[in-house]
Amino acid sequence: MSKKLVAYFSASGNTAALAKSLADKAGADIYEIRPSVPYTNADLNWQNKQSRSSVEMSDHSSRPELADTSADIAAYDTIYIGFPVWWYIAPTIINTFLESYDFSGKKIILFATSGGSGFGKTVENLRTSAPNAEIIEGKVNPSAKDIEVLAEMD
């Protein structure tokens, strides 16, 4: 049995709730991916082209700074990574997270929340940030049954 970690970024709390449920079902440790400067409601206003999230997502080289890099990635075989889908891809803080650690030989299983889109180009975009990891597209807005299925993936 592999050692599992659920790492997640949650701007509104929706992804956090799923992450906690998945960690419980998978018997995994949990780690919150936090920006050094927390997002405000104004930052998350996708309808404002000048909002922080809009600016970050329009610049694919944007790498928001992490609050910490204390996750012991080397100790895990399987890492679930959860996030809200923004502009059909993962928020760029997920790229920051992936580029901050060595994921070589790790299995990464993605899960996400979304107001209406699927993964889009998420997997393709994240592979460039963790090229030596196996990245698996999990589920968007997973149901309780989907969480059970994800928990068994390793």
Mark where each language-model region is:
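Alpha-helix N-cap/loop-to-helix initiation residues
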Residues: 12, 87, 115-119
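Short, conserved loop/helix-junction motifs that constitute active-site signature segments
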Residues: 73, 99-105, 128-130
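Glycine-rich, N-terminal phosphate-binding loop of Rossmann-like dinucleotide-binding domains
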Residues: 83-84
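N-terminal beta1-alpha1-beta2 submodule of the flavodoxin-like/Rossmannoid cofactor-binding fold
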Residues: 1-78, 88-90, 95, 99, ...
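Short, glycine-/small-residue-rich phosphate/pyrophosphate-handling segment
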Residues: 109-146
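A structural micro-motif
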Residues: 26-28, 106, 133-134
